[in-house]
Every structure is written in C-alpha cells, then in structure tokens.
C-alpha cells in the first residue's frame, strides 16, 4: 500500500494546481479558466470543455467536497482500493479516459508535444524544457502518443501496486519532470 500511496501523493501534487497543499475550488477554477485560453477554443467549444472538466473534478476528485487535503485524498483512494480493487481500476480507467478525451482537442486520437505542453500548463506545470523531457519518456512514435496508451499509462499509475512493472508516469515523477 505504501507504493500506491506514494504514487497517489505525486498525483495529488499535480491536482493541487496552485500548490497550496489543498485541492479546492481554486484549483478547479484555474483549470477551467486556463484550458480554453491555452487551447484557443471558440466560445462554444470552451463552454463544453469547461462543463466536462468541471464534471470530472467533481466526479473523481472533490466528490461533492469543497476541499480535500492530501491525507484525506490518500485515505479516500485507499478506502476505494481496499474495498473493491477491480471497481477501483475501472473507475480510474474511466477517470483518465474522461479527462484525456476533453483536453486533447484536436481529435486525432494522439497527443503531440504541443498538446502535452498545453495540457500540462493547465495543471500548473510551466517548465517547457522539463515537459519536453517528460513527453520523451513516453517514447512517442513520430512525435505522437496514442491517447489510449496515455490514458492507460495514467490508469496504471494510479491502480498498479506492483513496483516491478514498468510505469512511465512514475518514471516521469521520479525524474522530477513534473
């Protein structure tokens, strides 16, 4: 369980967009404000994306709460995981599919470096040099990562309790690239 908690803690730091130690509506609002600008979305596209991102935050992260601390976040994930491991895996596969289907707006079913950098900036990560190195850990084919592969990598990161299995997201965090 310690291995998973370490990974969940890393994820918490990504979700804590303003880096104040707590996930709150301010983190949600930051992503809702920044994403349409970063992607250059039309007003109609922005409204749809904002609605879907807001729903994602409420469904998978805040779950009706106004804020969540890291210990609460870890406890919540541990409770879900120990209660029903298969349901937990299914939930977080859906979680990452849902968010990647929103934030990769060009509908190519692949993530380019440009997509990756823009999406990372939405989460408060602005160092493009580190983001480029992080992107390269995914070993993109012709400069692209298939969305399904990326989504599966994140689901694996959150749900896999075996430290001997390859985990590109964990490698990204361990290398200090996010």
Walk through the language-model features, giving the residues of each:
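The feature marks the first
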Residues: 1-45
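Helix-boundary capping/turn motifs
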Residues: 1-7, 24-27, 48-49, 91-92, ...
